[in-house]
Amino acid sequence: MIRSRKRKNTVQAKIINKKLYIYLPSNMSENEEKRWIQKMVKWRENKKQLNNSLLLKRAKELNKIYFDDTLDFSIKFVTNQKNRFGSCTFKNKSIRISDRLSKAPKWVQDYVIIHELAHIVHPNHSKKFLEIVNQYKYAERARGYLIAMGMMKNKNY
């Protein structure tokens, strides 16, 4: 826990080298401090529960269904994507999925995974790319879910 005179109203938590650092205003009461510490410890535990092995297993299943098991890739949840649901680095075939999607329905997660897998084949949102993504029977529904939840900022997703 780190108290700061500059910090007036906000509380911040960071994980650095697997340690949780909580930044608090210096004028915060002990009761409020305890409440925030409990809240941030719970937040950290939730972050730990993101299961990359289950994500990889599901991505491999979708690779078999939609890409005939031809893609080689890595995939993991990340906590630093606030404006995207997923991203793909075409060059090293690395997929990152926002931890925000861990709370979304499975069919929405599947849509985002398929979308990112398709970027391994087509790095842009070309017609061929969209043909692949739209093979997913819940593609339109998932896009609607992301829009309705205010999560989707890019209409091309």
Place the predicted regions along the sequence by residue.
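Active-site-proximal or metal-binding-adjacent scaffold patches in catalytic folds
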Residues: 1-111, 120-157
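Walker B catalytic acidic pair
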Residues: 116
